[in-house]
Amino acid sequence: MSSVSAAGATPPASPGCIAGIGMDLLRIERIERALARHGDRFAQKILGPEELAKFHARRRRDPARGVRFLATRFAAKEAFSKAIGLGMRMPMSWRRVQTLNAPGGRPVLVIGAELADWFDARFGAAHVSITDESDMAAAYVIVERKPAPDGRP
């Protein structure tokens, strides 16, 4: 069964359904060039505090692994900004959302206080998947519609 109506338009989503999808794919070389050009200022502009600490730890152990970490976080932020429909404009900014890891290793989005009120008024849960290979990094984000006050989808 198709999700496209006879008129060709996608029907509106019900509360609790998908409200937004974002995807970003980038060449890791792009991040390497930005780091070479701007140094740590680039990472400090993009990463939140917990991400930045993890970036430095990974880069100390293996510089290439640090770059891949930064690339996946960059991609996740781009994908998230697309899923919420803002791009990189207020109240969205690079450091206001972090991709951290749950105890089992699953990536989770942590939305900073500066963005949380805006996000919580409009959306439900957000989900992220990230990956990297030798030359590419990618992230995919799905944002759920905010559930109805009575909890119905």
Curated annotation (Swiss-Prot):
What is this organism's lineage? Bacteria, Pseudomonadati, Pseudomonadota, Betaproteobacteria, Burkholderiales
* Xref: InterPro entries: 4-PPantetheinyl_Trfase_dom, 4-PPantetheinyl_Trfase_dom_sf, ACPS, Ppantetheine-prot_Trfase_dom
The gene is acpS
Which superkingdom does the taxonomy of this entry point to?
Bacteria
Q: Say what the protein does.
A: Transfers the 4'-phosphopantetheine moiety from coenzyme A to a Ser of acyl-carrier-protein.
- What is the similarity comment for this entry? Belongs to the P-Pant transferase superfamily. AcpS family.
Please tell me whether the keyword Metal-binding is annotated for this protein. Answer: yes
What's the name of the protein? Holo-[acyl-carrier-protein] synthase
Q: Which reaction does it catalyse?
A: apo-[ACP] + CoA = holo-[ACP] + adenosine 3',5'-bisphosphate + H(+)
Q: Which cofactor does it need?
A: Mg(2+)
Q: Where in or outside the cell?
A: Cytoplasm
Assign the protein's first listed, main location to one coarse class: cytoplasm
One GO cellular component from the entry?
cytoplasm
Can you name one GO molecular function term for this protein? magnesium ion binding
The protein's Enzyme Commission number: 2.7.8.7
Question: Which species is this UniProt entry from?
Answer: Bordetella bronchiseptica (strain ATCC BAA-588 / NCTC 13252 / RB50) (Alcaligenes bronchisepticus)
- Annotated residues that bind Mg(2+) are located at D24, E78
What GO terms in the biological process aspect are recorded for it?
A: fatty acid biosynthetic process
Q: Does the keyword Cytoplasm apply?
A: yes
Keyword annotations: Cytoplasm, Fatty acid biosynthesis, Fatty acid metabolism, Lipid biosynthesis, Lipid metabolism, Magnesium, Metal-binding, Transferase
Q: What class of enzyme is it?
A: transferase
